[in-house]
Amino acid sequence: MKRIRHSVVFLVGLMGLVQGFFGGGGLMAKGFSADSIAPKMQWFADAKLGIFIHWGIYAVEGTSESWSFHSRNTTYPYYMGQLKGFGAEKYDPKVWATLIKESGAQYAVITTQHHDGVALWNTQQLTPNTPWSLSAKDPLKMQKPALWNAKLPLSVVAQSPAKRDVIAPFASALREKGLKFGAYYSLLDWSHNDYPGLYNDQGRYKLAEDPMRWQRFLQFMHGQIGELSTQFHPDLFWFDGDWEHSNEEWNAPKIRRDILAANPNAIMNGRLQGYGDYATPEQNMPISRPTLIGLDGKAHGTLWELCMTSNDNWGWRPNDTLMKTSNEVIRIFSECLGMGGNLLLDIGPKADGTITWEQTRLLKDLGRWTSKHAEAIYGSLAGMPAGHFYGPSTISKDSTILYLFLTQVQGIGKDDKYINEEELEEAINEVLGKVGDDHIELDGSSGLTCSVMVKGLRNEILSAEVLGVEGKLRPKVVGKISWSSVPGTVFMEVPVDALDSDVTVLKLKLKGPLSLYRGAGGFH
């Protein structure tokens, strides 16, 4: 057999370390200091992975949640007519909780009420039956018949065939699995007749013209938040829909005050306009580490969470086939970890309460990877900044263990099946093409290796290994001048058959806390 050698080279530059991960765990707002918030944020900082669930009447026809009628892509009566089809016949919260646990997530957030104003719990707050046409000339303005029974709350309990609270059993199922429960709640409510907005081009009234009407809505909204607080004691409140009004108009201080009165350990996302605990970028992967902006307009706190769909929509859409692959999700998750953040990955169950097999498979694949690499994930701190390492990194809390995430190559090894060497070589060449490496050689007798290079590391490496694989790597230091303070360059040859099928993680145990050289080189 012809001897060919194959080497994949990764450049890993160690340049800097983000410190103080937990010191600013919450936003400094009026009456709340970062120091007083930080301890209760510990579980969130350590959790790293959560599952987001968008579920509501929009799953009946697979329409865009709330936005479809708000943007007039469908009529309001058609949208609200989905109430009659929401049955949740196959809903089993214990099955959901088991799958979430298997994914490696430490918490889950579910939509208790989206912008459409339909509650998924047994709320006792009444929603006036609103005219869906705002035109004075429209004969249907008075709306006959009504879209729901205004003598009963606008909820799936009172107005749909489901006839049950779907939030309470889910919260219980999560806690039975040792998971934290998060409640998504939309501040705005386009179905409430006392809320100013309805359509994107036309509202019911202007707040300044009818402040008493707005106060009636606030009483309704604060009443619902109070119900969620006292009935379910959420570990996390995930607010949304804040953009249509200011924090003064929402009375955000009261929201926070009331929640903490019911549960002092509850945390809130950053969509309370100055009264939340962590930043919440959406969909798009940040390049630099997000920070929470306080009431003073300055950055406060370092905790953040990326919320992201598993396909292109939050709720179930039958025509959305653009599922993210497990490899893509894991690589995105790795990037979040490298910047000290969390990933809140969304799924959208069907109206009957079942989760699609595509999303089930995604969560199971995620679970395989998280269980294998748990020590590099949970409780880790942000690693090196971007620009000098082609892949994220994390460190242990005592800074003596460095984890390198090799995201630039999709695994080729024990997790993938190839019939023969020709197929294996073809797969390798395909992967190398993706990373732009033109140095391609194969060695059928000596095996395949991936060469990882680390520079700027002052510490002695006590041991190096591939997480989840037996055996040790042999770091080699080159270019170290005995009389210079500039450290040498570290090379490690990683067997290709030790690579994970998604993202491989290397564990470097260091002598002492991580110490990095950040100079320009030369004779120092």
Q: Where are the language model's segments positioned?
A:
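Mature catalytic domains of secreted/periplasmic carbohydrate-active enzymes
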Residues: 27-524
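Short, surface-exposed linear motifs at loops/turns and structural transition points
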Residues: 23
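Bacterial N-terminal signal peptides that target proteins for export
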Residues: 1-11
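Bacterial N-terminal signal peptides
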Residues: 9-20
